[in-house]
Amino acid sequence: MELIVYSSPWCGDCREAKRFLAKHNISYKEINIEEVPDAAQEVIAHTGKRAIPQFVIDGKWVQPYTPGKGFHYEEMSKLLGIE
C-alpha cells in the first residue's frame, strides 16, 4: 500500500492523523503544503478545497476528518486494514 499524507505543521488534525499512523506503524510519505511547491494547488485540484489532512491511498484521495469534529479513526482503520 502506498500512502501519501498532505499536511502542515500548524494543522492539529494533521498531527492527530500522524499520531494515529505512528501508533499503528504505518509508513507514509508526507507532503507539507507550505513547503512543497504547488502541493496546496494539487490538493485543491483533487478535492475542490484547501483542506488538510488529505490522504492518498494507492492513488485514491481520502479526507480522514470532518472540520471541527476531528479525525475519523474507524473509517481510516478500515481503509488502512487495521483491526
Where do the language-model regions lie?
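Conserved beta-strand scaffold positions in the cores of enzyme catalytic domains, especially
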Residues: Y28-E30, W61
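Local sequence-structure signature of Cys/Sec-based thiol-disulfide redox active-site neighborhoods
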Residues: M1-I26
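Thioredoxin-like thiol-disulfide oxidoreductase module
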Residues: N32-R50, V56, K78-E83
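Thiol/disulfide oxidoreductase modules built on the thioredoxin-like
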Residues: I44-A51, V62-G68
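Non-catalytic, surface beta->alpha helical segment in thiol-disulfide oxidoreductase systems
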Residues: I57-E83
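Alpha-helical elements of the RecA-like P-loop NTPase motor core of helicases
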Residues: R15, R19, Q41, E74
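Nucleotide phosphate-binding site architecture
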Residues: G12, E34, Q63
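Short alpha-helical
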Residues: G12, D38, F71
